[in-house]
Amino acid sequence: MDPPRASHLSPRKKRPRQTGALMASSPQDIKFQDLVVFILEKKMGTTRRAFLMELARRKGFRVENELSDSVTHIVAENNSGSDVLEWLQAQKVQVSSQPELLDVSWLIECIRAGKPVEMTGKHQLVVRRDYSDSTNPGPPKTPPIAVQKISQYACQRRTTLNNCNQIFTDAFDILAENCEFRENEDSCVTFMRAASVLKSLPFTIISMKDTEGIPCLGSKVKGIIEEIIEDGESSEVKAVLNDERYQSFKLFTSVFGVGLKTSEKWFRMGFRTLSKVRSDKSLKFTRMQKAGFLYYEDLVSCVTRAEAEAVSVLVKEAVWAFLPDAFVTMTGGFRRGKKMGHDVDFLITSPGSTEDEEQLLQKVMNLWEKKGLLLYYDLVESTFEKLRLPSRKVDALDHFQKCFLIFKLPRQRVDSDQSSWQEGKTWKAIRVDLVLCPYERRAFALLGWTGSRQFERDLRRYATHERKMILDNHALYDKTKRIFLKAESEEEIFAHLGLDYIEPWERNA
Protein backbone atom coordinates (compact mmCIF):
# COMPACT_ATOMS: atom_id res chain seq x y z
CA MET A 1 0.00 0.00 0.00
CA ASP A 2 1.26 3.49 -0.80
CA PRO A 3 2.28 5.57 2.25
CA PRO A 4 -0.16 8.34 3.18
CA ARG A 5 0.40 11.70 1.47
CA ALA A 6 3.09 10.12 -0.69
CA SER A 7 2.65 12.82 -3.28
CA HIS A 8 4.17 15.35 -0.88
CA LEU A 9 7.17 13.14 -0.11
CA SER A 10 8.18 12.26 -3.66
CA PRO A 11 9.92 14.65 -6.11
CA ARG A 12 7.54 17.00 -7.83
CA LYS A 13 6.61 15.93 -11.33
CA LYS A 14 6.08 18.34 -14.16
CA ARG A 15 2.33 18.72 -14.71
CA PRO A 16 1.19 18.01 -18.24
CA ARG A 17 -0.01 20.99 -20.19
CA GLN A 18 -3.78 21.42 -20.23
CA THR A 19 -4.29 20.76 -23.91
CA GLY A 20 -7.54 20.06 -25.71
CA ALA A 21 -7.77 16.72 -23.87
CA LEU A 22 -8.76 18.55 -20.70
CA MET A 23 -10.94 21.17 -22.34
CA ALA A 24 -14.64 20.88 -21.60
CA SER A 25 -16.80 19.41 -24.36
CA SER A 26 -18.22 22.07 -26.65
CA PRO A 27 -22.03 21.95 -26.98
CA GLN A 28 -21.93 21.28 -30.72
CA ASP A 29 -19.81 18.15 -30.18
CA ILE A 30 -22.14 16.55 -27.62
CA LYS A 31 -24.38 13.78 -28.98
CA PHE A 32 -25.68 12.41 -25.67
CA GLN A 33 -27.06 15.36 -23.70
CA ASP A 34 -28.60 13.40 -20.82
CA LEU A 35 -25.35 11.69 -19.88
CA VAL A 36 -22.67 13.70 -18.02
CA VAL A 37 -19.45 11.83 -17.21
CA PHE A 38 -16.78 12.61 -14.65
CA ILE A 39 -13.61 10.47 -14.67
CA LEU A 40 -11.98 10.02 -11.26
CA GLU A 41 -8.21 10.57 -11.39
CA LYS A 42 -7.55 8.63 -8.16
CA LYS A 43 -5.52 5.45 -8.93
CA MET A 44 -5.80 6.21 -12.65
CA GLY A 45 -3.31 9.02 -13.13
CA THR A 46 -3.46 12.33 -14.97
CA THR A 47 -2.20 11.11 -18.34
CA ARG A 48 -4.60 8.15 -18.69
CA ARG A 49 -7.51 10.28 -17.46
CA ALA A 50 -6.76 12.96 -20.07
CA PHE A 51 -6.46 10.30 -22.77
CA LEU A 52 -9.86 8.75 -21.92
CA MET A 53 -11.51 12.16 -21.67
CA GLU A 54 -10.33 13.05 -25.16
CA LEU A 55 -11.45 9.72 -26.63
CA ALA A 56 -14.89 9.99 -25.02
CA ARG A 57 -15.37 13.57 -26.21
CA ARG A 58 -14.45 12.61 -29.76
CA LYS A 59 -17.32 10.12 -29.66
CA GLY A 60 -19.80 12.80 -28.56
CA PHE A 61 -19.86 12.21 -24.80
CA ARG A 62 -20.09 15.12 -22.38
CA VAL A 63 -17.13 14.77 -20.01
CA GLU A 64 -16.63 17.28 -17.19
CA ASN A 65 -13.19 18.40 -16.00
CA GLU A 66 -14.48 18.99 -12.47
CA LEU A 67 -17.10 17.30 -10.34
CA SER A 68 -20.40 19.18 -10.33
CA ASP A 69 -24.04 18.58 -9.49
CA SER A 70 -24.75 17.96 -13.19
CA VAL A 71 -22.65 14.76 -13.25
CA THR A 72 -24.74 11.62 -13.84
CA HIS A 73 -21.97 9.00 -14.19
CA ILE A 74 -18.72 8.76 -12.23
CA VAL A 75 -16.14 6.46 -13.81
CA ALA A 76 -13.22 5.04 -11.80
CA GLU A 77 -10.38 2.55 -12.21
CA ASN A 78 -9.13 0.17 -9.49
CA ASN A 79 -11.60 1.70 -7.00
CA SER A 80 -14.57 0.11 -5.27
CA GLY A 81 -17.87 1.91 -4.89
CA SER A 82 -16.96 2.52 -1.25
CA ASP A 83 -13.67 4.15 -2.31
CA VAL A 84 -15.53 6.49 -4.65
CA LEU A 85 -18.11 7.39 -1.98
CA GLU A 86 -15.33 8.18 0.49
CA TRP A 87 -13.73 10.44 -2.11
CA LEU A 88 -17.09 12.11 -2.82
CA GLN A 89 -17.67 12.83 0.87
CA ALA A 90 -14.27 14.52 1.07
CA GLN A 91 -15.21 16.94 -1.72
CA LYS A 92 -17.00 20.18 -0.99
CA VAL A 93 -19.25 19.91 -4.03
CA GLN A 94 -22.86 18.93 -3.39
CA VAL A 95 -24.18 16.37 -5.86
CA SER A 96 -27.93 16.86 -6.29
CA SER A 97 -28.70 13.18 -7.01
CA GLN A 98 -26.77 9.94 -6.59
CA PRO A 99 -24.70 9.44 -9.78
CA GLU A 100 -23.97 6.01 -11.23
CA LEU A 101 -20.65 4.64 -9.94
CA LEU A 102 -19.05 2.69 -12.78
CA ASP A 103 -15.86 0.88 -13.63
CA VAL A 104 -13.78 2.35 -16.45
CA SER A 105 -14.59 -0.75 -18.56
CA TRP A 106 -18.08 0.71 -19.12
CA LEU A 107 -16.67 3.92 -20.59
CA ILE A 108 -14.22 1.97 -22.77
CA GLU A 109 -17.10 -0.13 -24.15
CA CYS A 110 -19.06 3.09 -24.81
CA ILE A 111 -16.10 4.58 -26.69
CA ARG A 112 -15.73 1.43 -28.81
CA ALA A 113 -19.45 1.37 -29.58
CA GLY A 114 -19.60 5.11 -30.23
CA LYS A 115 -22.69 5.35 -28.02
CA PRO A 116 -23.77 4.60 -24.42
CA VAL A 117 -23.92 0.86 -23.73
CA GLU A 118 -26.11 -0.88 -21.19
CA MET A 119 -24.86 -0.77 -17.60
CA THR A 120 -24.67 -4.30 -16.20
CA GLY A 121 -23.52 -5.78 -12.91
CA LYS A 122 -19.97 -6.17 -14.15
CA HIS A 123 -19.75 -2.40 -14.69
CA GLN A 124 -21.28 -1.20 -11.44
CA LEU A 125 -18.93 -0.49 -8.55
CA VAL A 126 -19.82 -2.21 -5.31
CA VAL A 127 -20.37 -0.40 -2.02
CA ARG A 128 -19.41 -2.53 0.98
CA ARG A 129 -22.34 -3.28 3.23
CA ASP A 130 -20.26 -2.57 6.34
CA TYR A 131 -19.26 0.78 4.80
CA SER A 132 -22.82 1.80 4.01
CA ASP A 133 -23.92 0.76 7.50
CA SER A 134 -21.16 2.75 9.23
CA THR A 135 -21.70 5.90 7.18
CA ASN A 136 -25.48 5.84 7.57
CA PRO A 137 -26.25 5.20 11.25
CA GLY A 138 -29.90 4.77 12.00
CA PRO A 139 -32.51 2.12 12.70
CA PRO A 140 -31.58 -1.53 12.05
CA LYS A 141 -31.71 -2.48 8.39
CA THR A 142 -32.85 -5.66 6.69
CA PRO A 143 -30.17 -8.34 7.14
CA PRO A 144 -27.77 -8.61 4.18
CA ILE A 145 -29.07 -10.90 1.47
CA ALA A 146 -26.26 -13.39 2.13
CA VAL A 147 -27.56 -14.15 5.62
CA GLN A 148 -31.19 -14.29 4.52
CA LYS A 149 -32.52 -17.64 3.39
CA ILE A 150 -31.36 -18.45 -0.13
CA SER A 151 -32.79 -21.65 -1.57
CA GLN A 152 -30.57 -24.41 -2.88
CA TYR A 153 -33.07 -24.72 -5.75
CA ALA A 154 -32.81 -22.37 -8.74
CA CYS A 155 -36.60 -22.60 -9.15
CA GLN A 156 -36.97 -20.72 -5.84
CA ARG A 157 -34.56 -17.95 -6.85
CA ARG A 158 -35.11 -15.10 -9.30
CA THR A 159 -32.15 -14.94 -11.66
CA THR A 160 -32.10 -12.15 -14.23
CA LEU A 161 -29.43 -11.41 -16.83
CA ASN A 162 -27.94 -8.79 -14.48
CA ASN A 163 -25.05 -10.90 -13.20
CA CYS A 164 -23.15 -9.09 -10.42
CA ASN A 165 -20.60 -11.91 -10.03
CA GLN A 166 -19.47 -12.63 -13.57
CA ILE A 167 -15.79 -12.97 -12.65
CA PHE A 168 -16.76 -15.95 -10.45
CA THR A 169 -19.52 -17.45 -12.60
CA ASP A 170 -17.34 -17.39 -15.73
CA ALA A 171 -14.72 -19.35 -13.79
CA PHE A 172 -17.21 -21.98 -12.60
CA ASP A 173 -18.80 -22.26 -16.06
CA ILE A 174 -15.36 -23.11 -17.49
CA LEU A 175 -14.67 -25.66 -14.74
CA ALA A 176 -18.12 -27.22 -15.22
CA GLU A 177 -17.57 -27.46 -18.97
CA ASN A 178 -14.20 -29.13 -18.44
CA CYS A 179 -15.81 -31.68 -16.11
CA GLU A 180 -18.51 -32.29 -18.70
CA PHE A 181 -15.83 -32.93 -21.33
CA ARG A 182 -14.24 -35.44 -18.94
CA GLU A 183 -17.65 -36.95 -18.09
CA ASN A 184 -17.14 -36.15 -14.40
CA GLU A 185 -20.83 -35.57 -13.65
CA ASP A 186 -20.58 -34.93 -9.89
CA SER A 187 -17.99 -32.17 -10.19
CA CYS A 188 -19.81 -30.71 -13.19
CA VAL A 189 -23.03 -30.40 -11.15
CA THR A 190 -21.09 -28.88 -8.22
CA PHE A 191 -19.67 -26.10 -10.37
CA MET A 192 -22.96 -25.54 -12.24
CA ARG A 193 -24.86 -25.10 -8.97
CA ALA A 194 -22.21 -22.72 -7.65
CA ALA A 195 -22.39 -20.58 -10.79
CA SER A 196 -26.19 -20.66 -10.69
CA VAL A 197 -26.56 -19.43 -7.11
CA LEU A 198 -23.96 -16.68 -7.64
CA LYS A 199 -25.83 -15.44 -10.72
CA SER A 200 -28.93 -14.90 -8.57
CA LEU A 201 -27.23 -12.61 -6.03
CA PRO A 202 -28.12 -8.88 -6.26
CA PHE A 203 -24.67 -7.89 -4.94
CA THR A 204 -21.05 -8.58 -5.83
CA ILE A 205 -18.98 -10.81 -3.56
CA ILE A 206 -15.92 -8.81 -2.49
CA SER A 207 -14.86 -10.78 0.59
CA MET A 208 -15.29 -14.31 1.93
CA LYS A 209 -17.63 -12.91 4.57
CA ASP A 210 -20.11 -12.28 1.76
CA THR A 211 -20.35 -16.02 1.04
CA GLU A 212 -21.66 -16.91 4.50
CA GLY A 213 -25.10 -18.51 4.40
CA ILE A 214 -25.10 -19.03 0.63
CA PRO A 215 -25.95 -22.64 -0.37
CA CYS A 216 -24.12 -24.72 -2.99
CA LEU A 217 -20.73 -23.26 -2.07
CA GLY A 218 -18.62 -26.13 -0.72
CA SER A 219 -15.04 -25.89 0.48
CA LYS A 220 -13.55 -26.40 -3.00
CA VAL A 221 -15.80 -23.75 -4.51
CA LYS A 222 -15.04 -21.30 -1.71
CA GLY A 223 -11.33 -21.91 -2.18
CA ILE A 224 -11.64 -20.85 -5.81
CA ILE A 225 -13.69 -17.78 -4.86
CA GLU A 226 -11.09 -16.77 -2.29
CA GLU A 227 -8.27 -17.13 -4.80
CA ILE A 228 -10.11 -14.95 -7.32
CA ILE A 229 -10.77 -12.29 -4.65
CA GLU A 230 -7.09 -12.24 -3.67
CA ASP A 231 -5.38 -12.74 -7.06
CA GLY A 232 -8.01 -11.69 -9.59
CA GLU A 233 -7.97 -15.15 -11.20
CA SER A 234 -8.09 -18.86 -10.44
CA SER A 235 -5.01 -20.98 -11.05
CA GLU A 236 -7.26 -23.99 -11.70
CA VAL A 237 -9.24 -22.13 -14.36
CA LYS A 238 -6.00 -20.89 -15.90
CA ALA A 239 -4.72 -24.47 -16.06
CA VAL A 240 -7.95 -25.64 -17.72
CA LEU A 241 -7.82 -22.88 -20.34
CA ASN A 242 -4.24 -23.89 -21.17
CA ASP A 243 -5.06 -27.60 -21.21
CA GLU A 244 -4.72 -29.15 -24.67
CA ARG A 245 -7.57 -31.59 -24.11
CA TYR A 246 -9.99 -28.84 -23.02
CA GLN A 247 -9.00 -26.63 -25.95
CA SER A 248 -9.48 -29.51 -28.40
CA PHE A 249 -12.88 -30.56 -27.01
CA LYS A 250 -14.04 -26.94 -26.96
CA LEU A 251 -13.08 -26.63 -30.62
CA PHE A 252 -14.48 -29.99 -31.77
CA THR A 253 -17.84 -29.61 -29.99
CA SER A 254 -18.31 -26.21 -31.63
CA VAL A 255 -19.08 -28.13 -34.83
CA PHE A 256 -22.80 -28.89 -35.28
CA GLY A 257 -23.27 -32.65 -34.86
CA VAL A 258 -20.06 -33.34 -32.91
CA GLY A 259 -20.46 -34.60 -29.34
CA LEU A 260 -18.17 -35.92 -26.63
CA LYS A 261 -17.64 -39.38 -28.12
CA THR A 262 -16.51 -38.02 -31.48
CA SER A 263 -14.35 -35.38 -29.79
CA GLU A 264 -12.68 -38.09 -27.70
CA LYS A 265 -12.03 -40.16 -30.82
CA TRP A 266 -10.49 -37.24 -32.74
CA PHE A 267 -8.38 -36.20 -29.76
CA ARG A 268 -7.02 -39.74 -29.30
CA MET A 269 -6.20 -39.85 -33.01
CA GLY A 270 -3.97 -36.82 -32.47
CA PHE A 271 -6.12 -34.13 -34.09
CA ARG A 272 -5.91 -30.63 -32.59
CA THR A 273 -7.31 -28.42 -35.38
CA LEU A 274 -10.47 -28.54 -37.49
CA SER A 275 -8.48 -28.13 -40.69
CA LYS A 276 -6.62 -31.39 -39.96
CA VAL A 277 -9.90 -33.16 -39.18
CA ARG A 278 -11.56 -31.96 -42.38
CA SER A 279 -8.62 -32.91 -44.59
CA ASP A 280 -8.19 -36.45 -43.20
CA LYS A 281 -9.47 -38.92 -45.79
CA SER A 282 -9.87 -41.77 -43.29
CA LEU A 283 -12.63 -40.03 -41.32
CA LYS A 284 -16.30 -40.53 -42.14
CA PHE A 285 -18.67 -37.70 -41.23
CA THR A 286 -22.43 -37.84 -40.61
CA ARG A 287 -24.80 -35.63 -42.63
CA MET A 288 -25.12 -33.36 -39.62
CA GLN A 289 -21.35 -33.03 -39.22
CA LYS A 290 -20.88 -32.32 -42.94
CA ALA A 291 -23.42 -29.50 -42.63
CA GLY A 292 -21.69 -28.33 -39.46
CA PHE A 293 -18.38 -27.97 -41.30
CA LEU A 294 -19.97 -26.47 -44.41
CA TYR A 295 -21.66 -23.62 -42.52
CA TYR A 296 -19.22 -23.47 -39.60
CA GLU A 297 -18.40 -19.74 -39.68
CA ASP A 298 -22.06 -18.74 -39.57
CA LEU A 299 -23.04 -21.31 -36.95
CA VAL A 300 -20.31 -20.36 -34.45
CA SER A 301 -21.20 -16.68 -34.71
CA CYS A 302 -23.93 -15.49 -32.36
CA VAL A 303 -27.54 -15.15 -33.46
CA THR A 304 -28.84 -11.67 -32.64
CA ARG A 305 -32.35 -10.99 -31.36
CA ALA A 306 -33.16 -9.21 -34.64
CA GLU A 307 -32.11 -12.33 -36.57
CA ALA A 308 -34.15 -14.54 -34.23
CA GLU A 309 -37.22 -12.31 -34.73
CA ALA A 310 -36.74 -12.47 -38.51
CA VAL A 311 -36.61 -16.28 -38.35
CA SER A 312 -39.72 -16.22 -36.13
CA VAL A 313 -41.70 -14.36 -38.79
CA LEU A 314 -40.69 -16.91 -41.45
CA VAL A 315 -41.48 -19.87 -39.17
CA LYS A 316 -44.95 -18.49 -38.40
CA GLU A 317 -45.65 -17.78 -42.08
CA ALA A 318 -44.77 -21.36 -43.00
CA VAL A 319 -46.64 -23.01 -40.12
CA TRP A 320 -49.79 -20.91 -40.58
CA ALA A 321 -49.85 -21.75 -44.29
CA PHE A 322 -50.75 -25.33 -43.28
CA LEU A 323 -52.20 -24.91 -39.77
CA PRO A 324 -53.75 -21.43 -39.32
CA ASP A 325 -54.81 -22.00 -35.69
CA ALA A 326 -51.35 -23.12 -34.51
CA PHE A 327 -49.54 -21.39 -31.67
CA VAL A 328 -45.85 -20.72 -32.44
CA THR A 329 -43.71 -19.61 -29.49
CA MET A 330 -40.02 -18.72 -29.47
CA THR A 331 -38.46 -20.49 -26.47
CA GLY A 332 -34.92 -20.92 -25.09
CA GLY A 333 -32.65 -18.04 -24.19
CA PHE A 334 -34.50 -15.50 -26.32
CA ARG A 335 -37.71 -16.09 -24.34
CA ARG A 336 -35.64 -15.46 -21.19
CA GLY A 337 -34.65 -12.04 -22.53
CA LYS A 338 -31.23 -12.77 -24.01
CA LYS A 339 -30.02 -10.53 -26.82
CA MET A 340 -27.73 -13.19 -28.30
CA GLY A 341 -27.88 -16.95 -28.73
CA HIS A 342 -26.42 -19.84 -30.71
CA ASP A 343 -29.72 -21.13 -32.10
CA VAL A 344 -33.43 -20.35 -32.11
CA ASP A 345 -36.00 -22.76 -30.64
CA PHE A 346 -39.72 -22.80 -31.40
CA LEU A 347 -42.59 -24.70 -29.79
CA ILE A 348 -45.54 -25.39 -32.09
CA THR A 349 -48.94 -26.65 -30.97
CA SER A 350 -52.52 -26.57 -32.22
CA PRO A 351 -55.91 -26.93 -30.44
CA GLY A 352 -57.08 -29.42 -33.05
CA SER A 353 -55.13 -32.69 -33.14
CA THR A 354 -55.33 -33.87 -36.75
CA GLU A 355 -53.32 -35.75 -39.35
CA ASP A 356 -52.41 -32.34 -40.79
CA GLU A 357 -50.64 -31.57 -37.53
CA GLU A 358 -48.66 -34.83 -37.64
CA GLN A 359 -47.39 -34.00 -41.14
CA LEU A 360 -46.83 -30.31 -40.37
CA LEU A 361 -43.05 -30.28 -39.90
CA GLN A 362 -42.44 -32.30 -43.07
CA LYS A 363 -44.69 -29.91 -45.03
CA VAL A 364 -42.79 -26.92 -43.66
CA MET A 365 -39.48 -28.55 -44.69
CA ASN A 366 -40.82 -29.19 -48.21
CA LEU A 367 -41.98 -25.59 -48.50
CA TRP A 368 -38.62 -24.17 -47.39
CA GLU A 369 -36.75 -26.53 -49.74
CA LYS A 370 -38.79 -25.19 -52.67
CA LYS A 371 -38.03 -21.62 -51.59
CA GLY A 372 -34.33 -22.35 -51.16
CA LEU A 373 -34.41 -21.53 -47.44
CA LEU A 374 -33.39 -24.95 -46.11
CA LEU A 375 -29.71 -25.91 -45.87
CA TYR A 376 -30.08 -29.03 -43.70
CA TYR A 377 -32.71 -30.79 -41.60
CA ASP A 378 -33.14 -33.88 -39.45
CA LEU A 379 -36.73 -34.79 -38.62
CA VAL A 380 -37.15 -36.91 -35.49
CA GLU A 381 -40.51 -38.67 -35.22
CA SER A 382 -42.56 -38.58 -32.04
CA THR A 383 -42.34 -41.44 -29.56
CA PHE A 384 -44.67 -39.69 -27.09
CA GLU A 385 -47.14 -41.87 -25.16
CA LYS A 386 -49.90 -40.20 -23.14
CA LEU A 387 -49.85 -42.67 -20.25
CA ARG A 388 -46.07 -42.91 -19.89
CA LEU A 389 -44.82 -41.61 -16.53
CA PRO A 390 -42.48 -38.60 -16.62
CA SER A 391 -38.78 -39.43 -16.65
CA ARG A 392 -36.98 -39.43 -13.31
CA LYS A 393 -33.79 -38.11 -14.96
CA VAL A 394 -33.25 -34.38 -14.51
CA ASP A 395 -31.65 -34.05 -17.96
CA ALA A 396 -34.03 -36.35 -19.86
CA LEU A 397 -34.91 -35.46 -23.45
CA ASP A 398 -38.57 -35.39 -24.45
CA HIS A 399 -40.37 -37.63 -26.94
CA PHE A 400 -42.14 -34.98 -29.05
CA GLN A 401 -41.71 -34.76 -32.80
CA LYS A 402 -38.93 -32.28 -33.54
CA CYS A 403 -36.78 -31.02 -36.36
CA PHE A 404 -33.16 -29.88 -36.06
CA LEU A 405 -32.35 -27.70 -39.04
CA ILE A 406 -30.08 -25.07 -40.55
CA PHE A 407 -32.10 -22.21 -41.98
CA LYS A 408 -30.95 -19.88 -44.76
CA LEU A 409 -31.93 -16.42 -43.52
CA PRO A 410 -32.00 -13.81 -46.34
CA ARG A 411 -30.19 -10.58 -45.53
CA GLN A 412 -33.09 -8.34 -46.56
CA ARG A 413 -35.20 -9.88 -43.77
CA VAL A 414 -33.00 -8.32 -41.06
CA ASP A 415 -32.09 -4.75 -40.17
CA SER A 416 -28.41 -4.52 -41.20
CA ASP A 417 -27.54 -2.69 -37.97
CA GLN A 418 -28.93 -5.53 -35.88
CA SER A 419 -27.25 -8.53 -37.53
CA SER A 420 -23.85 -10.22 -37.67
CA TRP A 421 -23.25 -10.90 -41.36
CA GLN A 422 -20.00 -11.75 -43.05
CA GLU A 423 -19.14 -8.98 -45.47
CA GLY A 424 -20.58 -9.50 -48.93
CA LYS A 425 -22.95 -12.33 -47.93
CA THR A 426 -26.63 -12.09 -48.84
CA TRP A 427 -27.73 -14.74 -46.32
CA LYS A 428 -26.72 -16.33 -43.03
CA ALA A 429 -27.00 -19.93 -41.84
CA ILE A 430 -28.99 -20.09 -38.58
CA ARG A 431 -29.51 -23.12 -36.34
CA VAL A 432 -33.22 -23.65 -35.66
CA ASP A 433 -35.08 -26.29 -33.62
CA LEU A 434 -38.80 -26.87 -34.15
CA VAL A 435 -40.75 -28.89 -31.57
CA LEU A 436 -44.32 -30.06 -32.14
CA CYS A 437 -46.28 -31.04 -29.03
CA PRO A 438 -49.88 -32.06 -28.25
CA TYR A 439 -52.01 -29.08 -27.21
CA GLU A 440 -52.82 -30.47 -23.75
CA ARG A 441 -49.08 -30.79 -22.98
CA ARG A 442 -48.11 -27.32 -24.23
CA ALA A 443 -47.55 -25.85 -20.73
CA PHE A 444 -45.08 -28.60 -19.76
CA ALA A 445 -43.26 -28.38 -23.10
CA LEU A 446 -43.07 -24.58 -22.91
CA LEU A 447 -41.67 -24.70 -19.39
CA GLY A 448 -39.07 -27.30 -20.34
CA TRP A 449 -37.94 -25.67 -23.58
CA THR A 450 -37.66 -22.20 -22.02
CA GLY A 451 -34.83 -23.23 -19.67
CA SER A 452 -32.35 -22.42 -18.40
CA ARG A 453 -30.76 -25.86 -18.13
CA GLN A 454 -29.97 -25.44 -14.43
CA PHE A 455 -33.41 -23.98 -13.71
CA GLU A 456 -35.07 -27.03 -15.27
CA ARG A 457 -32.76 -29.46 -13.47
CA ASP A 458 -33.59 -27.89 -10.12
CA LEU A 459 -37.30 -27.68 -10.90
CA ARG A 460 -37.39 -31.44 -11.51
CA ARG A 461 -35.19 -32.10 -8.48
CA TYR A 462 -37.49 -29.95 -6.32
CA ALA A 463 -40.58 -31.79 -7.58
CA THR A 464 -39.03 -35.16 -6.69
CA HIS A 465 -37.43 -34.37 -3.32
CA GLU A 466 -39.79 -31.76 -1.89
CA ARG A 467 -43.21 -32.61 -3.39
CA LYS A 468 -43.01 -36.36 -4.14
CA MET A 469 -43.84 -35.63 -7.78
CA ILE A 470 -42.19 -36.34 -11.14
CA LEU A 471 -41.91 -33.56 -13.72
CA ASP A 472 -40.61 -33.51 -17.29
CA ASN A 473 -41.47 -31.83 -20.61
CA HIS A 474 -44.56 -34.03 -21.01
CA ALA A 475 -46.35 -34.12 -17.66
CA LEU A 476 -46.45 -33.75 -13.87
CA TYR A 477 -47.24 -36.89 -11.88
CA ASP A 478 -48.16 -36.96 -8.18
CA LYS A 479 -46.65 -40.17 -6.74
CA THR A 480 -48.67 -39.93 -3.52
CA LYS A 481 -52.07 -39.58 -5.21
CA ARG A 482 -50.97 -41.62 -8.23
CA ILE A 483 -52.49 -39.17 -10.70
CA PHE A 484 -51.36 -36.90 -13.52
CA LEU A 485 -51.87 -33.22 -12.70
CA LYS A 486 -53.26 -31.18 -15.58
CA ALA A 487 -52.03 -27.68 -16.40
CA GLU A 488 -53.14 -25.14 -18.99
CA SER A 489 -50.26 -22.75 -18.25
CA GLU A 490 -46.82 -22.53 -16.66
CA GLU A 491 -48.40 -20.70 -13.72
CA GLU A 492 -50.56 -23.76 -12.96
CA ILE A 493 -47.49 -26.02 -12.91
CA PHE A 494 -45.78 -23.75 -10.39
CA ALA A 495 -48.99 -23.73 -8.32
CA HIS A 496 -49.15 -27.57 -8.33
CA LEU A 497 -45.58 -27.57 -6.99
CA GLY A 498 -46.36 -24.98 -4.32
CA LEU A 499 -43.89 -22.52 -5.85
CA ASP A 500 -44.13 -18.80 -6.49
CA TYR A 501 -44.31 -18.17 -10.22
CA ILE A 502 -40.97 -17.24 -11.78
CA GLU A 503 -41.17 -15.17 -14.98
CA PRO A 504 -39.15 -16.45 -17.98
CA TRP A 505 -36.71 -13.52 -17.73
CA GLU A 506 -36.03 -14.55 -14.11
CA ARG A 507 -35.01 -18.12 -15.04
CA ASN A 508 -31.46 -17.35 -16.22
CA ALA A 509 -29.95 -19.64 -13.61
Swiss-Prot record:
Q: Name one Pfam family in it.
A: HHH_8
Which GO terms fall under molecular function for this chain's record?
Answer: DNA binding; DNA nucleotidylexotransferase activity; DNA-directed DNA polymerase activity; metal ion binding
Q: Where is this region: Mediates interaction with DNTTIP2?
A: 151-509
The entry's stated outcome for residue 343 to E is:
Nearly abolishes enzyme activity
Provide the function of this protein: Template-independent DNA polymerase which catalyzes the random addition of deoxynucleoside 5'-triphosphate to the 3'-end of a DNA initiator. One of the in vivo functions of this enzyme is the addition of nucleotides at the junction (N region) of rearranged Ig heavy chain and T-cell receptor gene segments during the maturation of B- and T-cells.
Q: Which reaction does it catalyse?
A: DNA(n) + a 2'-deoxyribonucleoside 5'-triphosphate = DNA(n+1) + diphosphate
User: Its family?
Assistant: Belongs to the DNA polymerase type-X family.
| Positions that bind a 2'-deoxyribonucleoside 5'-triphosphate | 333-338, 342-345, 448-449
E.C. number(s) listed in UniProt: 2.7.7.31
- Cofactor binding, per record: Can also utilize other divalent cations, such as Mn(2+) and Co(2+) (in vitro).
Q: Where are the annotated segments for Disordered?
A: 1-24
Q: Which UniProt keywords apply?
A: Magnesium, Metal-binding, Nucleotidyltransferase, Nucleus, Phosphoprotein, Terminal addition, Transferase
Q: Name one GO cellular component term.
A: nucleoplasm
Q: What is this protein called?
A: DNA nucleotidylexotransferase
Where is region (Involved in DNA binding) located? 258-262
Gene3D superfamilies in the record, alphabetically?
5' to 3' exonuclease, C-terminal subdomain, Beta Polymerase, domain 2, BRCT domain, DNA polymerase beta, N-terminal domain-like, DNA polymerase, thumb domain
Domain BRCT, first and last residues per copy? 27-124
How is the subunit organization of this protein annotated in UniProt? Interacts with PRP19 and DNTTIP1. Forms a ternary complex with DNTTIP2 and core histone. Released from this complex by PCNA. Interacts with TRERF1.
Motif Nuclear localization signal, residue range(s) on this chain: 11-17
Q: List locations, semicolon-separated.
A: Nucleus
Q: Where does Mg(2+) bind?
A: 343, 345, 433
- InterPro entries per the UniProt record, alphabetical: BRCT_dom (IPR001357), BRCT_dom_sf (IPR036420), DNA-dir_DNA_pol_X (IPR002054), DNA_pol-X_BS (IPR019843), DNA_pol_b-like_N (IPR010996), DNA_pol_lambd_fingers_domain (IPR018944), DNA_pol_lamdba_lyase_dom_sf (IPR027421), DNA_Pol_thumb_sf (IPR037160)
Q: Which organism is it from?
A: Homo sapiens (Human)
Phosphoserine sites (modified residues): 134
